[in-house]
Amino acid sequence: MSKTLSFKTYSAKPGEVKRTWHIIDAENQVLGRMAAQIANVLRGKHKPQFTPHIDTGDFVVVTNAAKVALSGKKRDDKTYFSHSHYPGGVRIDSVKDLLQKKPEKVIEHAVWGMLPHNNLGRQLFKKLKVYAGPEHPHAAQMPVEMKINQ
């Protein structure tokens, strides 16, 4: 008798997932390209065990967020719009101001836009750690350096 082939789709279980820590130096990295790769690692799309409805991704630490590069004239022209839901509660922040005050928010905003906007996306987003300078408190996790494809 011949062996029968199994055509069952593999679905990862939350307990089976092996998570690693990655570190990215954002200095002179283009924001959008870097954010796309970070989102893929957070989701786990770089692993063969990727399952869309399960958190199979890894942790990502981003350093030097204040030195991120923006292509074109985005550093001067790009703005972020938010509203407090009160009359006159419009708030418009430019990237230039945010990079001076809270440079972490620029990378977090870009990555959040590339993750699913549901409970799973919020869970994935918690695995992103962004720091303005080169120091980070995650040395004990032994993060692996990750290169960004340009």
Swiss-Prot record:
One of its GO terms (biological process) is negative regulation of translation. GO terms for molecular function: mRNA binding; structural constituent of ribosome. Signal peptide: none annotated. Gene3D superfamilies: Ribosomal protein L13 (3.90.1180.10). Keywords: Ribonucleoprotein, Ribosomal protein. Belongs to the universal ribosomal protein uL13 family. Part of the 50S ribosomal subunit. HAMAP family: Ribosomal_uL13. This is Large ribosomal subunit protein uL13. The lineage of its organism: Bacteria, Pseudomonadati, Chlorobiota, Chlorobiia, Chlorobiales. The gene is rplM.
